[in-house]
């Protein structure tokens, strides 16, 4: 099957998206708990009953057992495990890391994963620790590339399974780049990023950030990113915010064996707990004293179940934070419970500001909460300060995060939606022409001249509504974020001021008429786009002669859209210059 990956919503660098597999559609970000058939603490059937939609298991462990191998080939992996959700399989790469070798070739394990019906499979790459020597790392990279090339030569034979390609290289950035570039050329379905062993065990999150961001900057943005080995719920929000779409780990079980009780903020020792600070089914029906008195096997199973419930709850919260556009707030909250995670957050915001900003939505429906020094470095805050240079009005108000802000931006995100205890209420009201001129200059990163517009306000709340200029309605302001939504007349006015290709998406001639009649602008329709377009930007769609076709809202970034599937939506049309065709338009994904 071909890759179907569609972004529905963005926040930070996270994507609420749909991934179709032959066993069903996953909503990402998602956590894949590891199931070890040799140590079945919680069975896949029990996981399914807990609400888990996807799991990962080690195909090498199944392959190595004659009994399991025969059953998997005969019945399929889903039947063998008793799980009808999405099953991802690892290739045995972790065994290479732990033991130095596996008793199977890359081609054998690829064919085996395909034959047992894995939804998502992986090549035999070579995971590395942060303490590996340069020479050994080079050898591992060469082996990973050879195995990736072997997969590419077998692509047709292995169709109908989604395949993960994972670059390696450890802490040697040049090796990571070399491996990533080759993996990109081979065009896997799913991008993999291997967490750096040892460093992760030492809570060295900075090393993980640098490794992930190096790979993310090279691999195609239009594919999902799987971050191997990330399993503590306290880190899900953070790693989703930097662009990871899925995670896997056996930590829920390994921690349970050690008597460790997961929370969204860290880990507690069962021996030190007097009351369970959780209302999951396990904690609601047992108390710590009772669990401590159980046998090791019973205790481990209950703790593992609790740890899984917490992991499920947290990944749901991450998805909800993306929907509500408050993911950075969740990241900031979680990072304050571990100094290494907070240090990694500050490192991320300082070092990768441009890469983060390129995917950050321009507007959000949720307010921005200033909670510490990291708030000054958030990508939307840095962008907002940078865009103020396009505005030349004397009236100002002061904001801690932004400095002096033109009064005309009083109601625009993020200035009017920032919650900071040191900011005073702004009493002054901007003039109508001040609002429209400042907002357009900010929105389109271009200094507009003074526009003598007239505003219509809500009689009950005073909220800005319609905007008129010379007797024509040119647009309206969206109440929750103050963004200007142009009409077709407004779009024509904006085009008359903006230099080409500012604010525009240019559609190829073949697709001009269908877009002019209201069809979504798909990636394959686009000839050129303003690279400063961000998710939720208000965009003007034109033909190759720079004639207005439509207005709409961006789903993707202007610097990443071309890396997505040709059928992925880029601009959702709001208004169009021609009536919709009487014929039924082609079915599109909006």
From Swiss-Prot:
One Pfam family it belongs to? TGT_C2
Q: Which reaction does it catalyse?
A: guanosine(15) in tRNA + 7-cyano-7-deazaguanine = 7-cyano-7-carbaguanosine(15) in tRNA + guanine
The pathway noted for it is:
tRNA modification; archaeosine-tRNA biosynthesis
Task: List, in alphabetical order, the GO biological process terms annotated in this UniProt record.
Answer: tRNA wobble guanine modification
The record's listing under InterPro entries reads: ArchSynthase1/Queuine_TRR (IPR050076), ArcTGT_C1_sf (IPR038370), PUA (IPR002478), PUA-like_sf (IPR015947), PUA_sf (IPR036974), TGT-like_sf (IPR036511), TGT_C2 (IPR029402), TGT_C2_sf (IPR038250)
EC class of this enzyme?
A: transferase
Disulfide partners: none
Q: Where is the active site?
A: 90
Q: How and how many cofactors are bound, per the record note? A: Binds 1 zinc ion per subunit.
Identify the residues that bind Zn(2+). 278, 280, 283
GO terms of molecular function: pentosyltransferase activity; RNA binding; zinc ion binding
Using the record's annotation, list all stretches that form the PUA domain. 502-577
| Cofactor requirements of the protein | Zn(2+)
GO cellular component term of the entry, any: cytoplasm
In terms of superkingdom, the source organism counts as Archaea
Keyword annotations of the record? Glycosyltransferase, Metal-binding, Transferase, tRNA processing, Zinc
For substrate, which residues are the binding ones?
125
Coiled-coil regions in this chain?
Answer: none
Role according to the record: Exchanges the guanine residue with 7-cyano-7-deazaguanine (preQ0) at position 15 in the dihydrouridine loop (D-loop) of archaeal tRNAs.
Matching PANTHER family, A to Z?
QUEUINE TRNA-RIBOSYLTRANSFERASE
User: Which family does the record claim for this protein?
Assistant: Belongs to the archaeosine tRNA-ribosyltransferase family.
Q: What is this protein called?
A: tRNA-guanine(15) transglycosylase
